[in-house]
C-alpha cells in the first residue's frame, strides 16, 4: 500500500512540471520613495506654526539644604497662684500672677595654674666704676637788672579758685533675676625660670717675636762642564767623539765589558 502511494505521488509530480528550457531569473527592483527630511532649527523669524521651533531657556536653581539652628535655652518656670476673694456669692476668682523664677546660668571663671618653664639666658654681670673727668666749668656772672616804671599803679588781680563738688546720685536701674554659677576653668600662667648658660670665649693674642738680622746669601750652583767621551763604533775599530756627556750603551755591547 505504501509503495502504491509513493508511485502515485511521483507520477503526479512529473505531470505537474512543464518541460522545456529554463526561464531567466527576474529581479524586482522597487522604486525608491522620496524621503523628506525635516531639520528642526531655531528659526528667529515669523514662519508657519508647524515649522516654528521654540527657543528653550534653562533656568538653573541652586538648592541649599538648610539645617535648622537649634539654640537651647533654659525654659523659664512659671507658676500660677490662686487668690480667693470673698463675695456675697462664694465663687472663687482666679487672678493670674506671674512669678519669674531665677534662671541658673554657668559662667566659666579662670583659675590660675602656675607652669614653670625653663628659659635659657646669658648671665652677664656688670660693674659700674665712676671715672672722674676734669671738665672746666665756666662761671656765669649774674647781673641784676632793675627796671623802674614811673607812676605805675599796682592793682591786685582777683584769683578765682574753682571748687568742683561731685555728687553721686544713685539711679534706679532694672535688675534681672539671673543667678550666675561660676564654673572654674584652668588658666595657664607661664613663669619663666632663668637658666644660666656658660659661654666659653677663646681669644688669640698675637705676640711680636724678635727676628735676628741675618743676611741671605744666594745659593751657589756648581757649573759642571761635561767632558768629551770617546765610544767605539762598529767592528772596524773607529771612534766618534760626542759632546754633551756619556750616552747609554747599545744592547749588542752589553755583557762584553763595555757597559762598565
Swiss-Prot record:
GO terms for cellular component: extracellular region. Prismatic layer of shell (at protein level). Expressed primarily in the mantle with highest level in the mantle edge and lower level in the mantle pallium. Keywords: Secreted, Signal. It is found in: Secreted. Residues 1-16 form the signal peptide. This is Mantle protein.
Amino acid at each position: 500500500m505504501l509503495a502504491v502511494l509513493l508511485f502515485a505521488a511521483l507520477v503526479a509530480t512529473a505531470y505537474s512540471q512543464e518541460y522545456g528550457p529554463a526561464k531567466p531569473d527576474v529581479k524586482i527592483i522597487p522604486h525608491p520613495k522620496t524621503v523628506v527630511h525635516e531639520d528642526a532649527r531655531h528659526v528667529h523669524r515669523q514662519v508657519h506654526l508647524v515649522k516654528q521651533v521654540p527657543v528653550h531657556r534653562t533656568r538653573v536653581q541652586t538648592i541649599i539644604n538648610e539645617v535648622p539652628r537649634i539654640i537651647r535655652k533654659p525654659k523659664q518656670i512659671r507658676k500660677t497662684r490662686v487668690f480667693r476673694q470673698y463675695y456675697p456669692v462664694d465663687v472663687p476668682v482666679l487672678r493670674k500672677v506671674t512669678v519669674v523664677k531665677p534662671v541658673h546660668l554657668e559662667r566659666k571663671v579662670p583659675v590660675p595654674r602656675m607652669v614653670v618653664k625653663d628659659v635659657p639666658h646669658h648671665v652677664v654681670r656688670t660693674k659700674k666704676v665712676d671715672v672722674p673727668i676734669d671738665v672746666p666749668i665756666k662761671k656765669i656772672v649774674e647781673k641784676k637788672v632793675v627796671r623802674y616804671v614811673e607812676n605805675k599803679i599796682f592793682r591786685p588781680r582777683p584769683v578765682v579758685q574753682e571748687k568742683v563738688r561731685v555728687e553721686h546720685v544713685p539711679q534706679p536701674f532694672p535688675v534681672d533675676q539671673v543667678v550666675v554659677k561660676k564654673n572654674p576653668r584652668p588658666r595657664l600662667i607661664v613663669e619663666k625660670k632663668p637658666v644660666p648658660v656658660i659661654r666659653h670665649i677663646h681669644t688669640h693674642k698675637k705676640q711680636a717675636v724678635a727676628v735676628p738680622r741675618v743676611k741671605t746669601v744666594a745659593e751657589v750652583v756648581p757649573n759642571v762642564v761635561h767632558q768629551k767621551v770617546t765610544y767605539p763604533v762598529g767592528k772596524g775599530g773607529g771612534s766618534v767623539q760626542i759632546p754633551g756627556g756619556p750616552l747609554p750603551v747599545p744592547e749588542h755591547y752589553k755583557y762584553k765589558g763595555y757597559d762598565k
